[in-house]
């Protein structure tokens, strides 16, 4: 075991969530209830998973907190921004994800979490009509106001550290443009000239977070930190960034099931994925411009697992389609349908059907906990820039596409990356030995 330079998790950890909707309030409520011993954080890898460290007679399986210094749940303080002014208790009740018995015991704590005014541009989320928004003339003004919010929150709550995580709606698609997104100088210039076409509000949150010494996590498929200019800023500020798009349901299944097809060298003719969703996320995604952002994210999984360049006979002509349908009666209870057309020996066709009846926010909440705790850990370990070891939590993991890097989407390879990062930060050797 090697000596490490990971700083201890001393003092309070502020978690500032962009968005105070179903996902955010389910996350907050679960953490607060867990602290009181009234529920368990099921689904959280940082709270439940064990990793093997050592080999032979020295082999043992330890929880993450016994390998690396994770922040304690009792030390977490929540803050949030939202376009709607309702406090976290009101928002949790409105979301109808959790039952009253799971909200009322922490009512006072949730009521104390009041959203700050959001940096918002309705052109990026046309289905939202909240008025709890900042009056900013330019994108740069948004950055300055958000920086002040982080400074004030940190001071007011006595936080040693703050992590900012996006759990708000998907913005309309902003394609990467080398003329605006390549360098930090370009990004600064675009923000200060109020270039609203190329600078999304989410970029202002990321910029403010990084410049205030806070790791930033993009939980939606927004472009935001997935551009070289933001990587440069993360390097300059020595802060971790992670993204994008929480991997909760259908894509989680896809990233775990596609490796089965690949491992057995079965052919894949097509994969049709659709789901129905009735919460505010579904409402926003009913807008074509916003759905396109999500579509790009969800379509990226298969091609890096079942590779046409490696096995053209098996994967050279895959038809991959993804659809999301807004269906209000289901609210947060998302249902995913997958039809997978495969072929085997001598080209004979077969089919696989998957029907996943899930709860969107219940699956997402533990990801917020894990991503924030591990990003805070990464910052204290001196890790900055893109945190590829967090890919297991994300639909479209960030990678340096300017250097020809490809995302790792295979769930089992992602798990190895996560375990090895924890091992290394804990002073143990990384390895790929089968557990």
Positions of predicted regions on the chain:
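Metallocofactor- and cofactor-centric catalytic cores in central/energy metabolism, strongly enriched
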Residues: 1-220, 224-236, 250-258, 351-435
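Short glycine/serine/threonine/alanine-rich loop segments
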Residues: 213-214, 239, 265-266
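A generic structural signal for short, non-catalytic loop/turn and secondary-structure boundary residues
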Residues: 71-73, 157, 261, 333-335, ...
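Glycine-rich, aromatic-lined ligand/substrate-binding cores of catalytic
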Residues: 297-386
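Short flexible/disordered coil segments
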Residues: 222-237, 275-287, 304-313, 331-344, ...
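Conserved anion/nucleotide-ligand pocket segment
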Residues: 242-244, 248-314
